[in-house]
Amino acid sequence: VMLAGKLDSVPFPFIGTNVPEGHQGQSVEGMSHGCVLSKLKTGFHTRGIAWSFNADHQPIGGKFDSREDALVTGCVLASYITFDLSPELAQTKVADDAAAWCAAHVPVALMATVKARVAEVGASLDDTRGRPQGTPLHLNEADFSKLLAYVWPSLQKMKARDDKYAAARAKLFTTDAGRAYLRELSIDELPGLTTPETTAIMLALCEALGMKIHFVAPAFGFQKNMPYPDNVALRGLIEKQWAVCKDFGASIGFHSGSGKSAENYQVMGEVTGGRLEIKTSGRYTYEMGRALFASKNPADQALWRDWYKFTVELAILGAYSADATEQKMARVFVTDALSKCGRGVDVFSSPTVTRSAIESLAPSPEHMFWFEYNFLHVLAAGGRAEKAALGDHTPAGYRQRARFYAISDEGRLNFAKNIATYLVFLAQNTGLAPAAVCETARAKLAGYQTLAALLAGIAR
């Protein structure tokens, strides 16, 4: 698909354009193979530690119907699949009389089963003994019908996809361990903050369809790389969701979970008892930037300078875009960086004024505009800050990617230590590992002076 120039595109409203897709579908196949090979290469497999590969945001329905079989093939080594209903939801129009539509299109027995299951959960929540802040559910018939009419077409397609995943694994694996996989249901694409009632209905629907959900991802109002400002409010939101999830045996997935405060993570871990997943994909190119910024290698420094300049140019272009969303977001990114450095934020009278303000800042991977735009540099043809150059899967784009593959051992060591240190930070603050164990791990990481020593330590 890529070599034939047939990649689909993905909208990125904050940059006002579409970019050829790079992470959904068949690309999962290559990444999962790479992960398996890396474990064998480093000797990690000799430790006998179970690990999981997540096929993130696998698209259900919509324009992906025609590619479904290829998507299934791409996920056979994924032990953990996230179902993303948004492509089908985007083309679903709810009938004016949602209840009548449901009566005509949804099996009556299934609706009765779902309502009974939600009522059962609600009754258990009414009994607040042993439960933090009793949060009884209130199932409104009209709201139930509207939600069901909205999600039913996508859930039917999710069930069909799930059956195909199971069949593909049954064909290729001979053991129960190989055939098994975890399911995550992403519902943070539904409008607004997710209510406990919505979570209960979605979990009950999947349960009734024979799809055990191991993780569910509600919307908590998170923004990537930004701490949640109110820990008391966050605790309340999570407690209400956890009371429902616990009844279904599901853990909570925290999407846009990177860059939160230690206190935020402590709340997540305390409320769920460690039954959680934190999506950290927004963190990794940031940590690469920090690694190159700190490297003394001349080639690493040259890549860092080009990378930073690229984000500056996109920020300035975006700040004066005719697209309202792109302009708004670019200005938010710029003013955040300026205000955190103690600078004035009235800088949008002209592109020249904006450029002068940004260039007065010392280059840093901590600036929000760098964090938000940096991932686009990896496949920008020629490293150009132009919309036509973004997400380039031709040789020009891969020559740009090769610059990242060619970073020095010092840069690689910095990157590996940054990622590992971040994971230790998460493990400690969510309570997944004792503080003493985490402190030992941090000390060990700090002691690695060469990449070779770190890699050799993986198999020990």
Q: What residue spans do the PLM features occupy?
A:
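Short, conserved phosphate-binding/catalytic loop or strand-edge motifs used
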Residues: 177-183
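Short loop/turn motifs enriched for small/polar and acidic residues
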Residues: 186-190
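Conserved, mostly hydrophobic/aromatic
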Residues: 56, 185, 255
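Active-site capping/gating regions of soluble enzymes
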Residues: 1-38, 43-46, 50, 61-87, ...
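Active-site cores of enzymes that catalyze phosphoryl transfer or operate on phosphate-rich substrates
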Residues: 80, 84-165
